[in-house]
Amino acid sequence: GLSGAGRPGAGSLAAALAGHAQIGIPAFGIYGEHVQDADDTSIPEDVRTRLLDYATAGLAVAQMKGEAYLSMGSVSMGIAGSVVDPDFFGSYLGMRNEYIDMSEFTRRIEEGIYDPEEYEQAYQWIRENFKQGKDWNPPEWQYPEKHEDWWKFVTKMTIIARDLMHGNPRLAELGFEEEAGGHGAIVAGFQGQRQWTDHFPNGDVLETILNTNFDWTGIRQPSVVATENDSLNGASMLFGYLLTNTPQIFSDVRTYWSPESIEKATGWKPEGRAAAGLLDLRNSGSTTLDGAGKAVRDGENVIKPWYEFTEEDREATLEATTFHPASTGYFRGGGFSTHFRTSGEMPVTMCRINLVRGLGPVMQIAEGYTVELPDEVAFTIEERTNIEWPTTWFVPNLTGEGAFKSVYDVMNAWGANHGAISYGHIGGQLITLASMLRIPVNMHNVPAERVFRPKAWSLFGTESLEAADFRACETFGPMYR
């Protein structure tokens, strides 16, 4: 990190980096821009940023190694991301894959393989704290007589999913020693649709609670759980979580709303950040409650790490959220869906890993901001899709070029139906992490000064950095091959 004029100057760093490249080890080099005196022990801001980016991404790599992705179910509705690829998880992330059939939930519910005391505590807390909202189903699709049974069922599902991921020593005390161990899962996915949800209450409450900074036990560390068992979005959520320690928003990248379309549908002309249009990020009934943006820091709406989350944040988050009887058009077995609208203009980063046959994994990154819409405008747009689902309006930062020429171009270039949204502009750290794992980035809007990759990447070209990234990742190959 020291930029000095004395012997050997930058020579030792340059020599070391050249040697590493020559033997195929892509090392990172940190060299400050301004010359420092030899007795100056301060760390310049540019060096500090590089050190933190490297350490944060490196810790994420280390935390993933040896952990599991737990597939709870199989492929949801033919979604490609639900096809859990063990080569990707093993070769690129150093993770293993574990699998259960969704009938394991049925077995544990029917045979009482959960802590009955915790169930009573959880059920009471959920009924006292989760506000049940309007049933938006047509009258012939409404089943109010089943609601209480649905609440009991989804509470048990939530406890069981957590036990499957992390284990629960209480189960051993109850005589279920094998089940007490769990699967050592740092991330999981729940299939749900359609085989489960056509018959049983859906997994929306399960996914929502586990992804959130709190539950009936109080404020605690969230888990990472992907809707529809989309393992690639789950891995993307995991990246964001490990880099920030904040809960991740799982969303459908559902609709691009042009300013003209918004005005035509609502009579309101978009302004401010929304003037160029927006992306409607709306998941099918679940996402972290922290996505409501009701936590506050220095007067600003934020998403906090669990260890900064306060009781006031929890109360505001619950107040902003309603749980509606699930659309029985989608979910014949019933259940409940989470609804909120993300508050404030929060800086966020949306990312997604996609797999391409013959190429391998690639990553997309879009930094931008959430926006709020007037209530009547938001209501009208929500009615056009699903009013009972969690809603985040997202405006990516535009560069005027390529995939970020317009908001429409971002939507058009997005590689799949889902995205993982993290609080903060963390695109630079995602790029650093991706380079460590040899995952090329096929689109991003991160300013050049925040991009930090191994020094050897410059040996693959300096004019087109995107192309050089692909060549370098292909040459060095996955970390765990």
Role assignments for model-derived ranges:
Residues 1-2, 188:
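Short beta-strand elements of ligand-binding domains
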Residues 2-150:
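Cap/lid and interdomain-hinge subdomains that line or gate substrate/regulatory clefts
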Residues 92-93, 122, 133, 138-141, ...:
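Anaerobic metallocofactor- and corrinoid-dependent redox/one-carbon enzyme cores
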